[in-house]
């Protein structure tokens, strides 16, 4: 019997290399050298009479997103914790979050001693289902965290309305959506606070890093204190050689600051973000058409989305394809055909082994609290069903050309056609 699939030692669809990520911006190397020679490598270093890279990035990123304030931070996780604490979330409060997301969307809530309430998702967008959010609200609910997942913008019209109706802050987790827009506004600017990750894989990256944006001067000031050991920037510049942070005693914080090297890289990477996003979008739109012709359902976005950002490309397999096969068998076969990783979706948070609050003694705050933060108590049927049917891949593959999209489609067609080999 002839062998066709590469995973069974057949000939792969493609052996050529794929685009790599990160791709350094044209000015990144010079920017790093300027910081290296500046005598100031952190915001806690001595003021040298010129604007720090961190303040420059904060100014540029706020302007890019059309908001008044940006507070850079060490990571997306740190940014989300700043947002939660600045909005007053604390011990025992409930925070509604999606059941399908990266683990930090829930672990940060536990990290401020609050209780994540995981709710199901919209099957088309894979983002928070507004009806499920409304049904989950209780007198203990303190905030709603909405994640713009993979390449979709969540239904911000409905979610903002739900939050406003119940007097709750809406926190947008935009770790995967830099530059995406809802009704002409950048994501992150619709909620009370928007948070971002600049980790290695993100479309805007400095290796590690994060930021929180807001139009509220009060929330911004709280986040400044929370990320810099209770210190904030002064109203006037200090004398050269003095530290450009002042101790106010307003709010105890911790060190979650971005370094000057990371900030300098982000200033340059931001200049190229829109161009890269446009290329990803063009290629993804072509791939959407090619895969839909084969019966796959590419991830949709909500009404009101005016611009998508593709961090991860996701598509649902046809209902009658690969019945009885684990999704990992399918993704491994596609990976062998293409030479880059095709992966399942995230595991739903109520079954995700990375989200295990009971493994940390610091969260053992009494039997009742431990029951409330146990993720196994949630029932998320849409998350469970879809994660058995979704294939995903990283945005780097979308930085190529149309021939690359045809290769991906050809690999999917080949594995669909010869799926019997996966059962042998």
From Swiss-Prot:
Residue numbers bearing the N6-(pyridoxal phosphate)lysine modification: 202
UniProt-listed GO biological process terms: antibiotic biosynthetic process; polysaccharide biosynthetic process
Cofactors, names only: pyridoxal 5'-phosphate
Described function: Catalyzes the PLP-dependent transamination of 2-deoxy-scyllo-inosose (2-DOI) to form 2-deoxy-scyllo-inosamine (2-DOIA) using L-glutamine as the amino donor. Also catalyzes the transamination of 3-amino-2,3-dideoxy-scyllo-inosose (keto-2-DOIA) into 2-deoxystreptamine (2-DOS).
Cited InterPro entries: DegT/StrS_aminotransferase, PyrdxlP-dep_Trfase, PyrdxlP-dep_Trfase_major, PyrdxlP-dep_Trfase_small
A Pfam family: DegT_DnrJ_EryC1
Name the UniProt record assigns to this protein: L-glutamine:2-deoxy-scyllo-inosose aminotransferase
E.C. designation(s): 2.6.1.100, 2.6.1.101
Gene that this sequence comes from: tbmB
